[in-house]
């Protein structure tokens, strides 16, 4: 069963027409963008070991551009032949590609490391609540790229005996920048919005403060100005090379407040 939200408070079972019928005993399921192409894929754990007829032990469904799914061959799951009860996603090597941990019925759980080799980009977002709970559970994250939104809802348990990473994964495809990231804090009905977020980084957004940490800001900055904030003084920047430079100004919370692209010989 795959229940598609119709947007009016009702759902429709689209498992057969989308190719996600799981002819076995399903225990745990998780959506993930395994190849960061912006389309969510699906992994399902099963209660059989694959030795009984055509009953699947598990299945990975790769989403196509027409909202259908296929089970690809020779991508590493051929030995996924254990009875399992749950699964969860995280990023064991911080490369931006979601990995899968599977809880099997006996010892020796499976850890499936994502070896995708494409050049698609990604963004990871972690929340830190202040008025709401510290882990940011129960809130909505929206990113917007190329006229299209993606959403994640932070949870404290995605399935039976399973918990995903607190980092929410977004596949960006070929996009190198996210137009904006918006967090809606359910408990207070407030929003934090940050604009022009670079791809291929992990950021933490603190309730009411915007970006708390940003790998991109910390590691790719040529200079910092102090005191910050300040309201007096003039800073002059000279660019005398042929490279295309970008000037970005952030406040102490990591929020982008000013940006100029394509600085050359200025």
Residue ranges of predicted features:
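Blade-edge beta-strand/turn elements of extracellular beta-propeller
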Residues: 9-19, 68-77
